[in-house]
């Protein structure tokens, strides 16, 4: 059996800005670890499809949520936004 496929992970500019705004170092590390995990498993346990999100998935990292899409043909993950759980869905 061949090695596991690795997905390339891309962040939209808004997601990059949101990640930089996370002031809590522990939370930021948790988010980065979750993003890194998407390279080997773009649909980890706990990933949930967003209703009405046109293919958007959500993963949790503490109090933060990441919304992203997966392109299996291109082996790519696009992180659309990162935000605190209280306001990430309001966009």
Question: Where are the regions that the model predicts?
Answer:
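Basic, Lys/Arg-enriched alpha-helical interface segments
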Residues: 1-63, 71-78, 86-91
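Residues forming the ATP-binding cleft of Hanks-type serine/threonine protein kinase domains
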Residues: 83
């Amino acid at each position: 059996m061949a090695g596991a496929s690795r997905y390339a992970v891309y962040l939209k500019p808004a997601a990059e800005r949101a990640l930089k705004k996370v002031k809590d170092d522990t939370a930021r590390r948790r988010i980065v670890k979750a993003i890194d995990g998407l390279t080997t498993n773009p649909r980890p346990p706990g990933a949930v499809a967003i209703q009405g999100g046109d293919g958007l998935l959500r993963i949790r990292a503490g109090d933060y949520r990441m919304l992203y899409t997966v392109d299996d043909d291109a082996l790519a993950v696009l992180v659309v936004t990162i935000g605190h759980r209280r306001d990430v869905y309001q966009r």
